[in-house]
Swiss-Prot record:
Cell wall formation. Catalyzes the addition of glutamate to the nucleotide precursor UDP-N-acetylmuramoyl-L-alanine (UMA). GO terms for molecular function: ATP binding; UDP-N-acetylmuramoylalanine-D-glutamate ligase activity. Pathway: Cell wall biogenesis; peptidoglycan biosynthesis. It comes from Haemophilus influenzae (strain PittEE). This is UDP-N-acetylmuramoylalanine--D-glutamate ligase. Its EC number is 6.3.2.9. One of its GO terms (cellular component) is cytoplasm.
Amino acid sequence: MNAYQNKNITIIGLGKTGLSCVDYLLSQQANIRVIDTRKKPTGIDKLPQNIPLHTGSLNQEWLLESDMIVISPGLAVKTPEIQTALKAGVEVIGDIELFCRAATKPIVGITGSNGKSTVTTLVYEMAKAAGVKVGMGGNIGIPALSLLNEDCELYVLELSSFQLETTYSLKAAAATVLNVTEDHMDRYMDLEDYRQAKLRIYHNAEVGVLNNEDKLTFGEGENQARQTVSFAENSADYWLKTENGKQYLMVKDEVILPCEEATLVGRHNYMNILAATALAQAVGINLDAIRTALRHFKGLDHRFQLAHQANGVRWINDSKATNVGSTVAALSGLYVEGKLHLLLGGDGKGADFSELAELINQPHIICYCFGRDGALLAKLSSQSYLFETMEQAIAFLRPTLQSGDMVLLSPACASLDQFASFEKRGEEFTRLAQCLA
C-alpha cells in the first residue's frame, strides 16, 4: 500500500497546480476533497465531477477531518484556519513536497527574488544541449508533479519562497538562492522572515551556488549545502573578466564564453549566466553544451525584452520586474544614448521603494508612474509624472520621443491592481508600443 492510499487529503487551491495534485493523488488512491476560496476558481471545469468541492471560503470542518492538507503556495500557512488544523495534528505540505517524496532523479533547485526564471530556463537549455532528458517546472511552466509523467533524467525547478515554506524533503543535487531583496512584504514579517524561507532550498543540498555579492544568500544552520561554489563579478569561482575592453565569462582560469558571443546582454544577465553555468556543471553538464546553449538562448518574454524599435527609439518590456530589486538590476549599468523614459507602478506589495531614488534621479531619466502605488513612486524623482493607467502614460510620453531614447517598462510592482498578470501587462505595453510608436 502506498503512503496516500485511502488517506483523507484536502487540496486547497485549484488552477494548474491544484489540478496536478488532484491527478497525482487520484493515482495514489487517496480520498480527495478540494477547497478554493474563490467562488469560481480557474480549472473548476477540469475537476473530476466525483471530487467534493467547496468554494468561496476555507471549510474548517473539512480541514480538521483531513489526514493531510496540500496547500496552494498562494495561501499563507499562518492563515487562522490552517493554524487550527496544524494544532490539531493535521500535516500541511505543498505540491513540491509531494513531488520531492516521489522523484527519483536529481533535482536542480533555483530560487531568488530576481532572475530565477531566466536561470531555470538556462540550466534547462544547457541540459538539453548536452542530450540530457530534462524536465523543467515548479514556479515556471508546468507544475512539478506533472513532470513525474515524463521520462526525465534530471529535473530543473524554479521554486518560490511560498513553495519552499511547505517543502521538507527536497535534497537538491544543486541549489541556489540568486539574491534576496524585498518582495512579498505583505506576506512576511520582515526581510529576514522572507530570507529564511528562501534558504530552505539549501537543506540537504549537495552543492550550493552562492552569490558572493549578496551575503543574504548564504546558507546557515541546517539550511546549508554540503559543498559550495560561488559566482560574482570578482573574487568568485565563476566570474566576469575584463581585458582589453572585452568581457569574458569565466570559471576559475577558463573562459566559458566571451560576453559578446552570448545572446543575453547586461550585467544582471551575466550574473544569471554564471549562476546557471555553476548549477549545470554541478550536475555534470559539460562546457561545450553550456556554450551552445548560451549562444542560442534568446531570453524570456517580459524580461528586458525588445518589444519594438522604430525611429531610433527602443521599447523594452521588463514587465516581469514585479519588485524593486528587479528594477534596480535592470537599471544598473544600463546605457541609453538619449533619454530613458521609465514606466513605474502597480501594486508594490508593501515594499520600500527608497532604493530606487538614487538610480532614477538622473538628468536623462524621466519617470511615468501609474497604478495603485504610482503616487508613492512619483515622489522619488523630481522628473516624474503621475497617471492612472499605463496607457495614459504612454500616450503622454510618445510625442516627446527622439532618436536614441529608450522607453522601459520595469515597474517595480506587481500587476494585479490593473492587469490579470505581469504577462498581460507586458502584452499591453507591446501592443501600445507598436500601435503608438
